[in-house]
Structures are given as structure tokens and as C-alpha cells.
Amino acid sequence: MEERGRETQMPVARYGGPFIMVRLFGQDGEANIQEQRLYELLSDPRSALGLDPGPLIAENLLLVALRGTNNDPRPQRQERARELALVGILLGNGEQGEHLGTESALEASGNNYVYAYGPDWMARPSTWSAEIQQFLRLLGATYVLRVEMGRQFGFEVHRSRPSFRQFQAINHLVLFDNALRKYDSGQVAAGFQRALLVAGPETADTRPDLRKLNEWVFGGRAAGGRQLADELKIVSALRDTYSGHLVLQPTETLDTWKVLSRDTRTAHSLEHGFIHAAGTIQANCPQLFMRRQHPGLFPFVNAIASSLGWYYQTATGPGADARAAARRQQAFQTRAAAECHAKSGVPVVAGFYRTINATLKGGEGLQPTMFNGELGAIKHQALDTVRYDYGHYLIMLGPFQPWSGLTAPPCPYAESSWAQAAVQTALELFSALYPAPCISGYARPPGPSAVIEHLRSLVPKGGLLLFLSHLPDDVKDGLGEMGPARATGPGMQQFVGSYFLNPACSNVFITVRQRGEKINGRTVLQALGRACDMAGCQHYVLGSTVPLGGLNFVNDLASPVSTAEMMDDFSPFFTVEFPPIQEEGASSPVPLDVDESMDISPSYELPWLSLESCLTSILSHPTVGSKEHLVRHTDRVSGGRVAQQPGVGPLDLPLADYAFVAHSQVWTRPGGAPPLPYRTWDRMTEKLLVSAKPGGENVKVSGTVITLGEQGYKVSLDLREGTRLAMAEALLNAAFAPILDPEDVLLTLHLHLDPSRADNSAVMEAMTAASDYARGLGVKLTFGSASCPETGSSASSFMTVVASVSAPGEFSGPLITPVLQKTGSLLIAVRCGDGKIQGGSLFEQLFSDVATTPRAPEALSLKNLFRAVQQLVKSGIVLSGHDISDGGLVTCLVEMALAGQRGVTITMPVASDYLPEMFAEHPGLVFEVEERSVGEVLQTLRSMNMYPAVLGRVGEQGPDQMFEVQHGPETVLRQSLRLLLGTWSSFASEQYECLRPDRINRSMHVSDYGYNEALAVSPLTGKNLSPRRLVTEPDPRCQVAVLCAPGTRGHESLLAAFTNAGCLCRRVFFREVRDNTFLDKYVGLAIGGVHGARDSALAGRATVALINRSPALRDAILKFLNRPDTFSVALGELGVQVLAGLGAVGSTDNPPAPGVEVNVQRSPLILAPNASGMFESRWLNISIPATTSSVMLRGLRGCVLPCWVQGSCLGLQFTNLGMPYVLQNAHQIACHFHSNGTDAWRFAMNYPRNPTEQGNIAGLCSRDGRHLALLCDPSLCTDFWQWEHIPPAFGHPTGCSPWTLMFQAAHLWSLRHGRPSE
């Protein structure tokens, strides 16, 4: 469908030129969740909104705005048609069929009612639209102005047509209260917004409350120049390096991968470096805020893990609809953040979720608030910077995408992970291309801020000289379109202020010094430009630093100034002064003392409460209940460094107390012995590698332990005590972690306070109390961030402190988790408290009208408990353990029972008041020991003035085992684990109602997850697979190129897997390949990583199109694939699409010959979206057929093994429906999704074991077996310490897993079938 455009005069940022609007329709197969909810409402005869509609029909609606008119010359119309076809190809149109066409399944006539909707065309493009536009720009498209994906649904109406009340329901359920817009015919014919511009406020918001709080904590005028964070921090100068309040923990095993292909002989090294933990708490926080803040502390930091936490008001309201609306808002906001992080290539390893009732203190006025923590690695030399001075260049990294409704459900404007991944890659490459100090400025404001605030933070003195021709393209284009009447100094100043300086954005700003010196033949700007080009990162050299204050703009639009000329003298066309910092007068903060009505030590009358009813309420509360709707739908393991992520046990339940992130995945020999000569591989065979017995060496993995502690409601009740309790929780969460030295534990506090309630003295008192407490705990302390509620208004009394622990750790055996291990063992509890209900506890919130003051335990008792349990863990006595926190003792015990799927019998003394004892939240620990060790444990604890209690016994394993509590002779609770799991998972189920289709939520298979039974027997030997941990020098005869597409991260696991298999691995970026001989020296090609684009299928097809657009890159890859001496492997969504798109897998044909263009339309397969409609991070069984031709999987034929599977589109949909049978007969099926059994025929057909329910094929190989593409990612689990759960058949192994053989087999094959040479 086409509409003729017309010339119009539109406001700034609107496209008013001639254009054609094309509508394409795609049969979606089923309505989305919102459309289903609406249809159920309208079809309910009991509802006042009932319409008696006919069957619901829904489809995708693609709108494409193309430059020009139908009267343009034929060549222009042909090029426009080509670009429109390119859009269709990127979205799945192929030669065998079109997913998008001009014919709609709906017809708005007669009694048919049709409703079209989607993102607002009069607002900035959605994130999905901006990303596809970025792909089109890289592919050279010039006629496509904007693309948006909307929806269209309809039905036949048998009664009257929809009225105002029905339209209200549509607006609420489908349009998310006008977050999306209804599309009327011809609505955008008069113009639309093409640019990403968003008008900021008339003046930048300087956030005086936030600035004041930061000055109190980190120094400034409001604090009288005192830096409390530095005065009160507790660190060891012998073990730490610090910059101000920032504490760096050293490491000697930091993986460093060479980024230049010209590096020879070695591509990997273990270097000295530092680990830094950062974080912040922000209301309505941008999803990836910390990913930009961290470079503001250390510009070359490499994020290796992150953590997320949320605070929400409890979903309450006058009716069910209001509560459902609140739950939906929370579900979509948390999902948007989780998926942004899932696409960033940095795993999320820890988190929390807390709701506070609006009737409670701290709950009133609470805005959605997010904590985002990040663990970063920094190479030693990357800490060096230069002194700030005049004459330095100002650089802006990343596409200019001002914020607009980032957190408004359904979050179409959420941040782009692609943009942030490109910036991080560019900085990493820049540090390698120019390994000398050159960055002079990188500071950022403490919270989300306007561009002008970023520039103010960057400039400690003087000002900036900025050039209009070097501003972002959208801003520059808007200036160029200004008429003569407005193109004056004041007019341009107003435009630049509105559309560049005052909006908030996602860019990273730095200043760099450039002198005459060159490194590797490049100046600083040349190296930075090359790094950005290789990373696919947009960058702008905006101007230079000057002595003249403010922002001085030069109008060089008519004759652009080059970067070399920026240091010359120029007269400003207009100047913008930095906004003045508002000086706040003396205020009278609301006192933080406990209200007079608070009872300090209440006595509860609880005869009307039963343990069962209380436990049901506690377990189903969002603060305690399962967070599987978050944990299983964000990236948990990318990069391969994660040894402990949130999921534990056979059911992958999110119950881990701590995370463990390894610093290196590359193997070393015990005792620091040098690696064996690479010629060792000449004597190896697959049989030797498979049948070899493990060497028995004690393999040690070093890394960082991460935990979180927060007590938001208790902090609101009492700032000092709540802060101490958060510190206690963070410390006890680390009690069972493999920490090297308790004295190396670093506690970092992140403050979220309202200056109108907590003045300078109150903040100082709380920080001083925290410092004293840390000193008593015997741990180090620093302050990471200080933030305040968004408005700084007294209407919101919410305050919180999040404590994070980071500590060097090392392990060589199984990690201690809450998973109960052994039938007949005993459970021991040790607590620091009096057994009464803790003030601010969840029990008190739910069952008492009295808010009592919380009390933290004495530091000495907590220190003794932590160190005693650490000693027991190191001695090997502890089998499992869990901390006592939200929900109290009984919740801790239930969670341990669920994690291990084992029955538990608890015995409470007759004399005790068991109900307060069960729900008291006094900090403590519960751990499992064998009966023979109980005496030793009790003696050890009592010798340190602790009073442990033996609570009960662990029973048999199974979902129908019982959790039982006995009070003397009376059984006060007896429930099956299956029932308790349902109660504990009920909150996640509520959230899933908003996130997943009804057919999935109601499926009988939706809970069929976990209990993976593995069968790993090699047909080569008939023995269980125990691959040898063979550590050799990199073999120059087997060089493997890891191809890194623009916008991707997380390649480290592939690099490590091949390096551990003795190969010489290097990263290769698209822009490095300049001739078709580039890959001639390589025998292996690996494709993987995580692409930051929201649409995984689009990213894969666009990547193939980008390869085809570069003849040198395309021919080099095709030449490589056609060589008989090479192998390739593609892992994950992106890798499978690229290898299939290049013709290497998915059909019985050979790849095209070099010089032949790759036809993206001819791809034999496309990726099918997950049945849940969500990103999935699952630990699933994968079976390898006994007849597969794959050379890499030869040693694993006939095995069933669990593996990590992550992505949004985890199914294969063939364009030729008969192709799966053809491939099966040709032995080109590499693997299948498998059930929880070991029988070869028991393939998984249903979600979640089969994420898409589209067939069961999970991997393919070429006809000769040289090329392999897998949706799962074995590089993430080559070592047993990377596994989510080890099936009992493997015992307690500590070495490499059977998946290692896959990479070793590639090395052996290349030596025997290739043409290796040194």
C-alpha cells in the first residue's frame, strides 16, 4: 500500500519533505498477550464491555517511510524499491516465502473491526527502529527514512461497534495508556519525526539535591571541602590501590587477548591488573546506566559481571484492575532492564527484588528504583592518564540517542545494548592501538544528566570550543534546515540548547591529548578513529578545551573545520554558560528518629496465626518469592568466567547467596610449571584424550566473590541500624564462598538518601557508624555512590543502602551452595539475635500494625560467626549452607529444601515460642554437616562464644518428599516440596502472566525444567568421558580466527576454549579483513558472541548482509570455507545465522565460491522466536546423534549432555519443510534439544526444554562435517566449574568437562587433515 507524500512545513525534528509510506503485513500466527487480554474482556458475555466478537485475527504491521514520490525518475524508484526489498529481507523475507507482504489478513469493512497501533510516528523512533536504521546505514541505504513495527488486530462484531468504554479498555490494555499510538489511515502523511532528537527542558536540571548529597559524601562546598568517603574508608595500603574513594583489588591472572592480527606466536597472556566493583541506585534508572558510569571512573575498564536490584511499591489499589496494572508495569520495567543486560554480553550474576507497601514508612511515594552494580577488570597500564590542559580534543562516543520514556512500559525506547557494546569495544581497542597515556578527562555526573552537565563534569577549568559541523548528524541537519530568519546566533543557540545540550543521552565523553608522537604509526585521533571503525562505534570530535569559560560554539556549517584546525583561534558565534549551581538555603530536614508511636521491643499476641498460613504469605511475597522470571531471562554466563550464578541445584532455582567470577578461563599447569611443547599434540589421538584418566592435579580457579546486602525498609525505619543490617547481610552471604582471606573482604556502600530528610550531620553519623561497624567486622570499607529520590521531595520517604561485597577467592572443589547434599545429614543454625521478631521484618510488615526499630547484631559476634564458618568451609566439613535473611529461619530452611529437592524434618523445643523463632530475621546461617562431624562443629562454634542449635535432619531426594516442622510431639507444618515450590514460585507466575502467552503459562509442560540426567559415554572407548587437561604452548600450526561482528561482545569463552585445546587464537574484526588472503594462515574459524541489537534474527541477517557488502571480507570467508583443510564452528544465535547465511550449513550444497555474492534471501533457515517471547537463559539437555558427520563432535556421538542455551530465537525454521529429513539422512544433524531422560529417542518438544517448540534440532553440520553450527554454546561449559548443576553420574569432578573434547577434536583433525605449517 502506498501513499503519495507532499511537501510540508513541519516543526523542528519533523521530516516534512516528500515521502512514500509503505505498509507491509505479516501473519503473526497468534495475538500477543495484551491483545489476548483485550479479546477475553470483549468476548466475555458477563462483562459490561462485551461485544460478542468473532474470532480474533492479529498480524504484524510494518510501516516504512521512503524518501521521494512516485513521480521520481525511474533509477531513483528502482533504488528505492531495492532498499524496500532489503528491509523485507532483513526481516525474514526469502525466495521460498515472504513473512511480510502487501496483503493483509484483515479487512476493515462491514462488521469487521480493525485496530492498528504501534510507536508514535510524531515522536523519536523506537530503539528497534533506530537499530534497523543503523544496519541500513551500514548497508548503504539512503532512501529509507524510518521503519517501525506495529501491530494490527481485528474481529467481526456481532453487536454494536466499540464505544468509548471499549476504547478506554483498548487504550489501557493495548496502548499502555498512550505509550503506543493508534494508527489512523493517513495519520503520518503530513510528516513524521525521523531524527532521534528529543527536546530537553528549557534549562538543564542540575539536580541540586543529588549534587548536595554527593558533596556531603565525596567532598565539595556543601561538605566544607571534607571528603567523608575518604576519611571513613578502611583499606589496606599494602593490598590495595586507590584513587580517591575508589578501591582496586589486584590480580595476577587477568586474561588479556591481543586485538591485532599481526601479533605473532602468542595471542593470549595472563597479566597483572585490578578488579573494581562499582554501583549506583537511581529512581527510574536508565537500563544500562552503570555501563557508562564505570568508564567515568576508569576509562578502560572492561565489565565482566553485573548485578541488578529493584525497589517497587507493593501492587495495591482499590480493585483487581489497579493491582494488575501495577504488576504489569513492574513486569515490563524489570523485563526491559533484564533484556538490555542480556544483550550486552556481560552476565548478571546477583540481584534482589523488594516491594514495600505504600502504607508503610518508606513506601509512600516510592518510585521504581533500580540498583545496578558492575564488576570491572582493568589492565595495569590502563590506569595511566595525563594531566588535563587546554588544547585537548573533546570526544563523544556512541550514537546520539537522547532519552525519551526509557522506563515507560512496554519500553519501546529502552536503551540500546548495541550502542553500549560498541562503545566498550572501541575503548578496549583504543587502549591496544595506542598503549600510552592520552586521556585527560573522563569524569561523569553522579546521576542521569543532560549533555551540558556531562561537559561541565569533564572540564575542571576553562571551557570548550565546539564546532557546529562536528555535532551529531541529527542536530547538524536540524541546524542546516533552519531558515534565514532563525539561523541567527540566538536562534541556533536555542536549537542547540533544546536538542543537544539539555536532553539526557547515553554517550560517553572523554578528552584526549594529542601531540606529534605516533604509536604503531598512528596519532591519538587516528588510533581512536581506527578503534571506533573496527568496533562499529560512532564517534564525534566535537572540539577542544580552551581557557575561555563556558561552551563556545563556532559556526562552521558552511565551511567545516578539520580536526587539525580545531586548535587555531576562532571567534565564537554564540556562547552558552554552564548553568549555575543552585545554592540551597538552610533546611530543616525531617528528623530521622523513630516515631513516638514505635515500640522498641513489642510483645506479640499471635494465637490466631498458624505457621502454615504465615509461611504461605511469606513465600509468596515478592521480596522472598522466586525471581526465576528475571534470572532465567537475562544473560547469566556470557564470556565463560562465571563459576557461580544465581541458579543452583537440579531445578536451577535462583537461590545462590554469592556469585563467583573467575579472572581467567585459560588453563595453567599445577605449581606454575611451564606448558608442554605444542608438539605434544602430535602424539595425541581422540582415544587417548577420551580414555585418559584425570591427572589428579588439584586445579585451582581464582577470581572474585560478589554478594549483595540490602534492607530497604529497615533503612527507612532507622538509617544507622538498617545500614548495619545491610552490611551484615552482604557479609553473611559470603560466609560459604571460597574467600582467600577474610581480611581482604571489601564492603562497598551505595547510599540512596533524601537530603530533605537526612541532613549533613545525619549522613555523616550513618557513615561513621558504618565505618565503625566495618572496623569491628574486620573488613575493608569504601563508599561507592550516593544518590537521592528523583524529585528530592519529602513526599517520598524511601531511603536505602545497598552493600556489596567483593573479595579475592579461589577454589579447587565443588562450591558450597544452599543445595542439600546428603540424606541423613544434620542442619545446624547459628544466629546473632535473641529469637524475637526483628524490627522491620517481613513478618512484622504483613502481620503487625506496629513498626519497631530494627537492631543490628554486635560486630564482634558477626565477625566470629563469619570467620568460624569460613574455617569450617575450608576444612571440608560443610556440605551446604544458606544465610538467614528476609522471611527468617523457616524461609531459609524451605529454600534449602527446594534447592536440593530433599525432604527436611525440623524439631523445635517444646518450651520455645516457635512462631517468632521461625520468622525472626536476625542475621545468621544454616548449614548442613554429616552427623559424625556435629560434635566438632559445635565445639568449634562454642569456643568462639556462639550458640549453635541442631535443627533437624535432611531426608530423601524427590519432589514429593515432605518438609516437616515438629513442635515437641505436635507436627505444626507438613507440606510436600512440590506444594512449597508452587507457593514460592507464585510471584514469578504472576509476573509471567504479564510476560508470556497464555498458552505457555497454561501448558502442562511449563514446569518441566531441570533434573537433567546426562549420558556421557564415548563410543570410542565405552567409558565415561574424562578428557585430559592438556596444557601446551599455542600450536602455530592450528591458528583459529574468532570473528567479531560489529556490536558483539562475549567472545572470551570461544577464545579460551580453543586456547585450552592448544590452538593459537586471535580476534578478527570485520574491518581488519582487507583482502581475500587474510584468512589463508588460519585453519579454524569461530563465530559467536552476543549481539547487542534487540532483534536477534534481524542482527544475524544484517551481519550476513554486511559480510556480503565487503567483497574482501566475503571472499576471504568463502575462500576459507571452501578449503578442504579448514573447519569452522558457530555458536549461539548470531553464529548459526551467519554460517547458514553463508551456505556452510543448513543444506547439502557447498558454500558459494569466492567472488560470488551471498544471497541473504537464499538462507536455508531462519531463527524461530522463543515460545515465551522472552530472552531465555537455560541449562538444557543436548543430545548428539550417533551418526552425525561433525568432526568436532565425533568423540561425543551418542552422548546426552547439559549445556548453556541463551537467546531470544532458539529454534531453526527451514524454508524448505522437507530439509530436516534430507539433513537427517545425510547425517548433517549435529544435535537435538533433549528431554530429562537418557534414551536417544526422547527429544524435547515442549517449552522450556525446547525453547521455541519449532522442531527439536539444535545444531547442524556440513556434508563433510567440517563446519558446525550450534544454538547451544559448549564454550561456556568446557570446565565443570562452569556448569549450573552436575548430574550425579559425574560425581564431584573438578577438571574439564566432556565438551572440552569438541575443541580438542578440532585441533587433532586440523593436524591430520589439513596442511599445517609453522
UniProtKB/Swiss-Prot annotation:
The organism's place on the tree of life at top rank: Viruses
Any one cellular-component term (Gene Ontology): host cell
Report whether Iron shows up as a keyword of the record: no
Signal sequence interval, chain numbering: none
Subcellular location(s): the record lists: Virion tegument; Host nucleus
Q: Which UniProt keywords apply?
A: Host nucleus, Host-virus interaction, Late protein, Virion, Virion tegument
Q: Name one GO biological process term.
A: purine nucleotide biosynthetic process
The record's InterPro entries line, in alphabetical order, gives: Class_I_gatase-like, Herpes_virus_tegument, PurM-like_C_dom, PurM-like_C_sf, PurM-like_N_sf, Tegument_herpes_virus_N
Q: What are the protein's GO molecular function terms?
A: phosphoribosylformylglycinamidine synthase activity
| SUPFAM superfamilies tied to this protein | Class I glutamine amidotransferase-like (SSF52317), PurM C-terminal domain-like (SSF56042), PurM N-terminal domain-like (SSF55326)
Q: Into which family does the record put it?
A: Belongs to the herpesviridae MTP family.
**Role this protein plays:** Tegument protein that plays a role in the inhibition of host intrinsic defenses to promote viral early gene activation. Interacts with host DAXX and thereby disrupts the complex between DAXX and ATRX. Suppresses the DAXX-ATRX dependent deposition of histone H3.3 on viral chromatin allowing viral transcription. Targets also host SMC5/6 for proteasomal degradation in a CUL7 and calpain-dependent manner to support nuclear membrane-less replication compartment formation and lytic virus replication.
The protein's matches in NCBIfam families, at most eight in alphabetical order, are given as: tegu_FGAM_synt (TIGR01739)
On subunit structure and binding partners, the annotation says: Interacts with host DAXX; this interaction disrupts the chromatin remodeling complex ATRX:DAXX and thus allows viral transcription. Interacts with host SMC6; this interaction targets SMC5-SMC6 complex for proteasomal degradation.
By its UniProt entry, which PANTHER family does this protein fall under? PHOSPHORIBOSYLFORMYLGLYCINAMIDINE SYNTHASE (PTHR10099:SF1)
Name recorded for this polypeptide = Major tegument protein
From which organism does this entry originate? Epstein-Barr virus (strain GD1)
